[in-house]
């Protein structure tokens, strides 16, 4: 048996995995986010630990944990958890979706002109390094007391094992890691007036970083089992769905849309707002494009058009008048990350006439989200990734009609697989399983999810969509000056 813990933003999820790789028990505990000022997003690390402790005890009530061999941790990335020399938390953790430090991003890139080469990424307010610069500038008395900086899941590890440790995939999201070398960058740390001594030790995702402290093991009804490094949420989620080898790729359609592709070497294209991070598996990296509003656009449009829900919206789109002039939708309801890196980007309908009604608007929304997802996929492929097929997961991927439309727009074979909703906790448990079974291959331990349906792009429809995609791109560029 193996345990996977996923420290999310809205809750902690813990799962129990058997030797066959099946989830036999799961528990979730809710978390809340504090927003004391505009753009701020914070959580109390003590809340993380209390929720994890409750979830683990509930899991133990559901199923004996005596046979657990190892435990893995995944979690929300980028959060800045600041500790003093007595391991006390100095202030609430500043989360990945906190937007206060845009100025510090500009300042850091000016201080280290080669930062994009070292980190493989554009400096963004979500990342950890600019948050520390903000603390130094606005809370100097707190900054002076910092002994260690930990990422959210690694604070849980400290409470479980007493060890200061992190994994490569999560560390890559700090902007302090030399992503190609898989080591801390002294240049990036010095730019924030920090040193290696204030950073956790680095491990690969399936390496053991320590063991459960006796008092924690006793409280959870377990042995003092090894704890593995684990991974950031996206990398751990990818491990869970079997994204192991170079050129394997997955498209996750949730509130946001994430396109994740594995590479065997370090590739980057920071100017396109593609994230380039280490994978949670050794000698592997990954590229990731992020669309901020994917399935959330469908929820919004269903309400806007008076349709009861997303399935009704998709049914309406299928009834759209084929002879009507096309309508375009720019799906930037929360700004956009890849490829525009523009928090000021806005949503737009364009091309409306008296011919158009709710059905045509519904179709435009599905197509517009598809065009934006394809833009994100294209910039990842431009880095040198060549997937044969793309695994499609997430709640937004349930519609067969929309899945086929996405294949036709992108020109990619899309393989819809079920079971991806377990999320990063599954990847964390599988990383623990790898550590406990060194004699077994990754292919054996990390199978792909069951295939439900493959969607091949229709050549005719693909050809018809390309000029519309070009208009979609031109629309954004033409409207850009008005979006500031």
Swiss-Prot record:
InterPro entries: ATPase_NBD (IPR043129), Carb_kinase_FGGY (IPR000577), Carb_kinase_FGGY_CS (IPR018483), FGGY_C (IPR018485), FGGY_Carb_Kinase (IPR050406), FGGY_N (IPR018484), Xylulokinase (IPR006000). The active site is at residue 233. One of its GO terms (biological process) is D-xylose catabolic process. Its EC number is 2.7.1.17, 2.7.1.-. GO terms for molecular function: 1-deoxy-D-xylulose kinase activity; ATP binding; D-xylulokinase activity; protein homodimerization activity. The keyword Chloroplast does not apply. Substrate binds at residues 77-78. Sugar binding is accompanied by a dramatic hinge-bending movement that enhances interactions with Mg-ATP. Homodimer. Belongs to the FGGY kinase family. This is Xylulose kinase. It comes from Escherichia coli (strain K12). The gene is xylB.
């Amino acid at each position: 048996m193996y345990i996977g813990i996923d420290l999310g933003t809205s809750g902690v999820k813990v799962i129990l995995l058997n030797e066959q790789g099946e989830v036999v028990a799961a528990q979730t505990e809710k978390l809340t986010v504090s927003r004391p000022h505009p753009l701020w997003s914070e959580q109390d690390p003590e809340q993380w630990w209390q929720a994890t402790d409750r979830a683990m005890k509930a899991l133990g009530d559901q199923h004996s944990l005596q046979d657990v061999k190892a435990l893995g941790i995944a979690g929300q990335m980028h959060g800045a958890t600041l500790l003093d020399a007595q391991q006390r938390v100095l202030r609430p953790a500043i989360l990945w979706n906190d937007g206060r430090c845009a100025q510090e991003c500009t300042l850091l890139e000016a201080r280290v002109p080669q930062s994009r080469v070292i980190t493989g990424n554009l400096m963004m307010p979500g990342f950890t390094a600019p948050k520390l610069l903000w603390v130094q500038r606005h809370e100097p008395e707190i900054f002076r007391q910092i002994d260690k900086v930990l990422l959210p899941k690694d604070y849980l590890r400290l409470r479980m094992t007493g060890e200061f440790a992190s994994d490569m995939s999560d560390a890559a999201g700090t902007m302090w890691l030399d992503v190609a070398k898989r080591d801390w960058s002294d240049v990036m740390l010095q730019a924030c007036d920090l040193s290696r001594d204030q950073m956790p030790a680095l491990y690969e995702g399936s390496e053991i970083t320590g063991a459960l402290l006796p008092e924690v093991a006793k409280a959870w009804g377990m042995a003092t089992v090894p704890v593995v490094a684990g991974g950031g949420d996206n990398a751990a989620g990818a491990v869970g769905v079997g994204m192991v080898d170079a050129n394997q790729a997955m498209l996750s359609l949730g509130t946001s849309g994430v396109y994740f592709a594995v590479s065997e070497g370090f590739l980057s294209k920071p100017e396109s707002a593609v994230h380039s991070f280490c994978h949670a598996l050794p000698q592997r990296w990954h590229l990731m494009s992020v669309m901020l509003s994917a399935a959330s656009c469908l929820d919004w449009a269903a309400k806007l058009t008076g349709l009861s829900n997303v399935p009704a919206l998709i049914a309406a789109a299928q009834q759209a008048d084929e002879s009507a002039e096309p309508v375009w939708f720019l799906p930037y309801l929360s700004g956009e990350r890849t490829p525009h890196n523009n928090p000021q980007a806005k949503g737009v309908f364009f091309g409306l006439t008296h011919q158009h009604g709710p059905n045509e608007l519904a179709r435009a929304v599905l197509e517009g989200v598809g065009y934006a997802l394809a833009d994100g996929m294209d910039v990842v492929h431009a880095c040198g990734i060549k997937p044969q097929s793309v695994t499609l997961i997430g709640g937004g991927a349930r519609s067969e009609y929309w899945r086929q439309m996405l294949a036709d727009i992108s020109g990619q074979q899309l393989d819809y697989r079920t079971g991806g909703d377990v999320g990063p906790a599954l990847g964390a448990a599988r990383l623990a399983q790898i550590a406990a079974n060194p004699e077994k291959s990754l292919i054996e331990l990390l199978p792909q999810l069951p295939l439900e349906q493959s969607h091949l792009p229709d050549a005719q429809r693909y050809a018809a969509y390309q000029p519309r995609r070009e208009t979609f791109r031109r629309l954004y560029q033409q409207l850009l000056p008005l979006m500031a």
